[in-house]
Amino acid sequence: MAKLDKNQLIESLKEMTIMEIDEIIKAVEEAFGVSATPVVAAGAVGGTQEAASEVTVKVTGYTDNAKLAVLKLYREIAGVGLMEAKTAVEKLPCVVKQDIKPEEAEELKKRFVEVGATVEIK
């Protein structure tokens, strides 16, 4: 197997999606028995906020011609039937997924924005 240098590895990572990079991180953690979770220094109280570990993705709007595409994508991601998806998309804002990782939320937001939706992550 050809050995990659640091720059080649970084260039390869630039071409990947967040989800692919997350899978690589998990594989490295497992292979080497380490964790990529940052260590919080003892005594560091207040002053800084921790990044949200779980977030909620909401569709807050969509362009005039994007309703059908948003409905189809909502249905696919939320795993609901046509009528439930139609009701949710017509009564905005609607929660797509909740208690998910920020990386997954960004990926979902990207997919919805591509079809013409406005998305909020909280």
Curated annotation (Swiss-Prot):
InterPro entries: Ribosomal_bL12, Ribosomal_bL12_C, Ribosomal_bL12_C/ClpS-like, Ribosomal_bL12_oligo, Ribosomal_bL12_oligo_N_sf. Keywords: Ribonucleoprotein, Ribosomal protein. One of its GO terms (cellular component) is cytosolic large ribosomal subunit. GO terms for molecular function: mRNA binding; structural constituent of ribosome. Transmembrane segments: none annotated. GO terms for biological process: translation. HAMAP family: Ribosomal_bL12 (MF_00368). Forms part of the ribosomal stalk which helps the ribosome interact with GTP-bound translation factors. Is thus essential for accurate translation. Belongs to the bacterial ribosomal protein bL12 family. Homodimer. Part of the ribosomal stalk of the 50S ribosomal subunit. Forms a multimeric L10(L12)X complex, where L10 forms an elongated spine to which 2 to 4 L12 dimers bind in a sequential fashion. Binds GTP-bound translation factors. NCBIfam families: L12 (TIGR00855). This is Large ribosomal subunit protein bL12. It comes from Mycoplasma pneumoniae (strain ATCC 29342 / M129 / Subtype 1).
